[in-house]
A protein has these predicted regions:
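Juxtamembrane intracellular "pre-TM" segments in multi-pass secondary transporters
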Residues: 2-15, 199-231, 423
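Short amphipathic helix-loop junctions that connect adjacent transmembrane helices
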Residues: 31, 37-52, 239, 248-266
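Helix-to-loop junctions at the C-terminal end of transmembrane segments
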Residues: 65-82, 279-296, 381-382
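Glycine-rich segments within core transmembrane alpha-helices of 12-TM secondary carriers
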Residues: 65-66, 146-171, 365-374
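C-terminal ends and interior cores of transmembrane alpha-helices
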Residues: 88-108, 302-319
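Symmetry-related core transmembrane helices of the 12-TM Major Facilitator Superfamily/SLC fold
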Residues: 90-97, 178-195, 388-406
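Intracellular juxtamembrane helix-capping segments at the cytosolic ends
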Residues: 126-140, 337-351
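C-terminal transmembrane helical hairpin of 12-TM major facilitator-type secondary transporters
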Residues: 295-342
Length: 423
């Protein structure tokens, strides 16, 4: 494919690379709810108290600390499939095995075992994310970042919806054990995407020792960005802080506060969620290049925060099927758009030689709202109620939006090389 052809919008969207990015996004999204919303609903059905459920958000801490072992994925190249795809395959095989083991656990009689298995799923899933994120950072050209990020997020969200819709309906008809087994099968099928992905060339300057694999990514990041590195890290932590906190408890809100059945939750997610993800992915891929990254981040960020007020209305008014459908639809549209722009910025901030570690650092920080401070959400709900919780999470978006103004243009919108531009 020539650079000119690849530079045209139509050819970018229709390329095999975008299809693979979407498929790998699906692989990344599949395990997430198994340690998040679906697990929370399983614990809710097992009569586990709200504070314990909120504490279970901590099983996802590997997503927050994955930067600690990401240097190993930059340093070591598996003997098969290459530096990026090799690690994808290893983690995907591991995920299939641990998810099957999770299916045999019982949270009501052995909560501790469920927690350990959930941590294992999160660790393998986080490592898979490191490999896939590095693959995207290495493979996507500058002009492909917006579309590639949108394709990845679209696949990611579709996977989450598959688990959170069909999965919940299946749980109502059968059991959560069947849901986990079914997810393991889908995870096994995702291995096909790993074989179809192109393996990026290993840079000559990649780390040759563990020491350099650990030190170089951080030193290079701060040297290249200067003072803006601190703003970039704060932005990564705060842009989606409130949304991450909502993510950890919204399933319990539907189930316990609104007294919705698993089938109802699954049906609404299927109808409103799939439509929202599709529209959000299209809008993100189309609007981000036209608006520019900074304006896209601001617009999408405001939309993300605003959707939480629909949950405030639900908490105050009680169950309304119209409002539930509207909240889920708008939430998925806004969050898909925000996440796509967010990830495109992360790619722009990384150096391909050490992309696994640098991207992992940024995405690790982006999950602190749920993984590190998830327990705060449980305390707010227990002490002040759901309406206060959702209102507070909307306000938590403000610091991240302010930081968007301070991100240097050279960081979030690097110039496209003339020969790579489309006509």
């Amino acid at each position: 494919m020539t650079e000119k052809k690849r530079g045209t919008w139509a050819s970018i969207v229709a390329s095999r690379r975008m299809a693979v990015a979407a498929a790998l996004g699906f692989a990344s999204g599949l395990p997430l709810l198994l340690t998040g919303q679906v697990l929370g609903l399983w614990l809710t059905d097992a009569k586990i108290d709200i504070k314990t459920i909120a504490l279970f958000a901590s099983v996802g801490l590997p997503y927050t600390f994955k930067f600690a072992w990401a240097p190993l994925l930059d340093r070591y190249v598996p003997p098969f499939l290459g530096r990026r795809r090799g690690w994808m395959l290893i983690t995907q095989i591991g995920l299939v095995g641990v998810i099957v083991a999770m299916a045999s656990a019982d949270p009501s009689s052995n909560t501790e075992l469920v927690a350990y298995l959930a941590v294992a799923i999160a660790a393998l899933s986080a490592t898979q994310d490191v490999a896939i994120d590095a693959w995207r950072a290495d493979v996507l050209a500058v002009e492909e970042r917006a579309a590639g990020s949108a394709a990845y997020v679209l696949g990611y969200r579709v996977a989450m919806l598959a688990v959170g819709t069909a999965g919940l309906i299946l749980a109502d008809l059968t059991s959560f054990r069947v849901v986990y087994l079914g997810t393991a099968v889908l995870m096994a099928l995702c291995i096909i995407a790993t074989f179809l992905a192109e393996e990026p060339a290993v840079p000559e300057a990649r780390p040759r020792t563990v020491y350099h694999a650990v030190v170089t990514p951080f030193a290079e990041f701060f040297k290249r960005l200067g003072w803006a590195a601190l703003i970039a890290l704060a932005f990564a932590a705060l842009y989606k802080f409130g949304d991450q906190m909502v993510d950890g408890l919204v399933g319990t809100f539907w189930r316990r506060e609104l007294e919705m059945s698993k089938t109802e939750i699954g049906t609404f997610n299927k109808a409103a969620g799939f439509a929202g993800v599709a529209l959000g992915g299209i809008l993100a891929g189309t609007l981000t290049p036209r608006l520019g990254t900074r304006r896209a981040l601001l617009l999408f960020g405001v939309l993300q925060a605003s959707t939480n007020f629909l949950y405030v209305a639900l908490a105050l008014m009680g169950k309304s099927y119209v409002l539930v459908g509207a909240a889920i639809f708008v939430d998925y549209v806004a969050n898909t758009m925000g996440t796509a722009a967010f990830m495109a910025v992360f790619i722009a901030m990384t150096n391909k030689e050490v992309s696994a570690t640098q991207y992992a650092l940024l995405t690790s920080l982006s999950s602190v709202g749920k993984r590190v401070f998830g327990w705060v959400g449980g305390d707010i709900v227990a002490g002040a109620g759901w309406a206060t919780f959702f209102g507070a999470t909307a306000a938590m978006a403000i610091p991240g939006l302010v930081l968007v103004f301070f991100l240097p243009r050279s960081v979030i919108e690097p110039p496209v090389k003339p020969e790579a531009q489309g006509s």
